[in-house]
Amino acid sequence: MSEDMEFENWGSTQSSVEKFCYKWTISNFSFCMGGIQRRITSPVFSSEENKEVAWCLRVYPKGADKESKDYLSVYLVLLSHLQSPVWAKFKFWIINSQGEKYQKTKSPIVECFLTYEQSGFKKFLPRDLLLSHRNCLLPEDQLTICCKVTILGRKYNMPSQNITPAIKDPRHLLTDDLGELWENSLFTDCCLLVAGHEFRAHKAILAARSPVFRAMFEHEMKESLKTPIKIHNLNPQVFKEMMSFIYTGKAPYLHSHSMACDVLPAADKYGLVSLKVLCEDAFCRNLSVKNATHTLILADLHSTEKLKTQALDFIAYYASEVCETSEWKSMVESHPHLVAEAFQSLASAQCSFLEPKVISGSNQL
């Protein structure tokens, strides 16, 4: 068969790859030795290209378990709550006193990361070797660890022929058209008053999307609908975000913890179940030691069970850090039942995310 033959059909598969490095310096390392399974956790970090995927490093100076008690253990941990796993390879090394890379060790395969799961090397470096070469590896009692992460992105299949641009999804056309009605106040039949600002809207759309608005329109006298409907306890920006969701099913600015704090009560009040789900997702993606307590209180107040579970798991995982915050100390006084639930969650040693996942990589000098 000739190698110069022409192919009638062909295609290709392309994969995107994202790479970034993180350097972590641990000062006064000799005072951080602790015992077996005692860990040190780095600050949260992410790549410049993808801030939504958050990571941290963990070091166990005296090993992650009894088997590795004579070694330094190091791990990479995924912190973000994502809908699908993250596939990544990684490499660790130490920076010595000369600025050189030492003990370069890489994962032999692409690892599948789920939320709170960690992968790494429980026998990264013999502790005796580290301490006996402290002048070189621990200059000024500082341990500097570097990690290079390579994330495998989506795969794209490229067809063999030019394709006519796809027709836009009719559902997107519908939401665009409804969004235009809202944005341009076209053919409106009611007026809503929010903190002194008037917004024109459509009763049929509001009634179809919100059982609260539906009940309001069913029971109000026709005469009263000629005057603006007062919306209480909402600021205009949050109201616009809620209305954008009512008309288009999207909440374009619902990506921060602060906006989610304001939108969740509105979604709960007006019976917008899907918007509550979007709020839960925003909270989960932005969970931190600082806001975990407030997130738990909101989840309990507005009966969002998924978010409450995530908040309890997060607090259990970072119990020592969370318990030092002023928010936690305030909750001890104001919401003792949530403190009890948090301790119950902490006591559940079966939580799968607490168990380190170890890969058997070989150290390479």
Swiss-Prot record:
Residues 188-255 form the BTB domain. GO terms for biological process: protein catabolic process. InterPro entries: BTB/POZ_dom, MATH/TRAF_dom, SKP1/BTB/POZ_sf, TRAF-like. Residues 19-149 form the MATH domain. Coiled coil: none annotated. Belongs to the Tdpoz family. PANTHER family: SPECKLE-TYPE POZ PROTEIN. This is TD and POZ domain-containing protein 1-like. It comes from Mus musculus (Mouse). The gene is Gm9125.
